[in-house]
Amino acid sequence: MSIKTIKDFDFSGKRALVRCDFNVPLREGNITDDTRIRAALPTIEYLKSQGARVVLMSHLGRPKGERNLKYSLMPVAKRLSELLGQDVKMLPDCIGDEVATAVSNMKNGDVVLLENIRFYRQEEENCNDFAKKLSQNGDIFVNDAFGTAHRAHASTAGLAAYLPAVGGFLMEKEDEFLGKILKNPESPFVSIIGGSKVSSKIAVLESLLPKSNVMVIGGGMAYTFLKVEGHSIGKSLLENEYIDVAASFLKKAKELDVKVILPLDHIVASEFKEDSIPEYVDAIDIPDGKIGMDIGEKTLRKIEEVLVSAKTVIWNGPLGVFEFDSFSKGTAKVAEYVASCSGITVVGGGDSVAAVNKFNLSEKITHVSTGGGASLEYLEGKILPGIKVLEK
């Protein structure tokens, strides 16, 4: 999809109303990970350099339409001031006379941050009146919050009815790389899809199947596919109601000549607990009473083998119970293999992104997506409301 970007407009002396995703983790009022704030810097710096008056807005947490200081963006304003090397004024609200006065007093290159837009329930209701009030803070609407692009909220979609709408650099980058995956990926194209449930990933699997040369299926959902193929899976996760769906998917993969890689060996445990003792099973079949928790060495070697020649790779979702250290090796190793691949590599989805960040590999990945649910819906082929309003 081709979107309008900030380079398509002259921002000199204009008020740029920028929707960012500053939904950062906080502990006792302190930011524990500022990745999302840093991701917005290129857009903010560019707008400043063009002489814009930059008005930033975001949500933080789930205040459920009520003013709750626990979810104030004050810590974000403080961190932004440090990163930008200038004072970022924190405004007491996101609409109203006090905000209007502060915005009208801005000079070119100034940056202010509006208070949490989710202090108003009308934000998530995509209320026209609220979007109109927000629009009074800007001349041009810039959406740089890909992480919320799948939500039709006042600040992600509704504003486009009242202001010219463009995408920031982060939005443009997400659209470019995820779009490339869906439209014309260079072959060989390898899709690695993990996660616990077939039900939550089947739409992505079906969307990527016709474009893939090889598809790796891992995580808890792999056991439903192994069951379809006649293997015993012990006490591993099984979605009985998705047996037919999985069977039909494997049949379609065969018809399309897509090589599907399922686990060839396993790391298992007797109980689904963090302190369970890992046991290795050198076979596709899992013994009775055992639960599949991670992929084994044979499976990892097979994945490494297909990634060596891959020209395009998309990885979404963990290959094992990544949150338990004893069962995180499969996901960690796949992160290494993807990082070593010489082709275009795109990683999206909470746990796969966490793995890449945990092992300091993000610099070696072509594109690490900032959107969890948004990335997933984009890869499913859905039209995202926050991107649709930016189309050329």
Swiss-Prot record:
The keyword ATP-binding applies. Substrate binds at residues 21-23, 36, 59-62, 118, 151. It is an enzyme of class 2 (transferase). Its EC number is 2.7.2.3. Its main location: cytoplasm. It catalyses: (2R)-3-phosphoglycerate + ATP = (2R)-3-phospho-glyceroyl phosphate + ADP. One of its GO terms (molecular function) is phosphoglycerate kinase activity. GO terms for biological process: gluconeogenesis; glycolytic process. Pathway: Carbohydrate degradation; glycolysis; pyruvate from D-glyceraldehyde 3-phosphate: step 2/5. ATP binds at residues 201, 292, 323, 349-352. It comes from the Bacteria. Belongs to the phosphoglycerate kinase family. Monomer. This is Phosphoglycerate kinase. The gene is pgk.
